Amino acid sequence: MQKNVREIAVLMQDKEKEYKICEKLRRQPELSGLKILCREQLQSLGPSETFNKRLKRLEPLAGRVLLTDLRDTELPEVVKNIPSIGYGFDYRGSAKYVVENTDSIDKMYLETVYCRYYRLPLEIAETDRLILREMQLTDLDSLYEVYDTLRDCPYIEPLYERAEEEEFTRQYIKNMYGFFEHGLWLVIRKEDNKVIGRAGIENREIDGELQKELGYLIGKPWQGKGYAAEACLAILDYVKERELCSHLFLCCHQKNIPSISLAQKLGFTVYAEDIDGMNLYVCSIN
């Protein structure tokens, strides 16, 4: 899995509170392997300016995330340009991510904060053969190659023309990944880093309510090898772990037998049939 974050720097108004938070983070099994540093530890390395000298080395992609309850004006200048998480219900800073306690902080959460700040594609899941990650504009050539192998498939809508697809992708990254924290992700074969498809979670209005829908496609040369099932099982685990929803839907053409077979294998059951030639399936997440 993606391992950008290596260190959490904790800065709190109250030193005792800061120490307790650091100790709690160190005891959380899901954060094992990460360095947890508070102001006192850094200052003990030398004179008072040691802390700021250390922070000046916090360069982009250095692997640090700041957890703080300080206002922006109270932060040392050099930590205003690293990924930050606000702490406490009364936090008044500008961090886009805020937690009331440390229970929700795990490595995936830290990676999300880090990647959003530096506009990096977030890795969602890793299986024996695959990596699922968010796409970026530089992936478009690979995506066009995948869709070109499916040009004769009646169930797949083609991509837009290049300029329009680039703009669509920019907005998708900003609004789906950035706001909803899910979307369609790239399916990448680990052995050669080849993009072989897409799979992920989209939004769909069903019976007047916004629901989560599983979607997937694998390029023709890589079909029949179990890649779709492997990717979808990883997504179901991700949805369960992140508690994204209690039910997940899936929509496919009623004549798309391989897709129907996969849906049933994944535990989906019929929710509605023959809606303009499409079947709707549902799966309980528990």
Please provide the spans of the model-predicted regions.
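GNAT-family acyltransferases
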Residues: 1-11, 24-32, 100-221, 234-238, ...
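Asp-based, Mg2+/Mn2+-dependent phosphohydrolase catalytic module
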Residues: 1-125
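Glycine-rich acyl-CoA binding loop
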Residues: 224-229
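Conserved beta-strand-loop-alpha-helix junction that forms the acyl-donor binding cleft
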Residues: 249-260
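Conserved SAM-binding loop
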Residues: 66-68, 132, 252
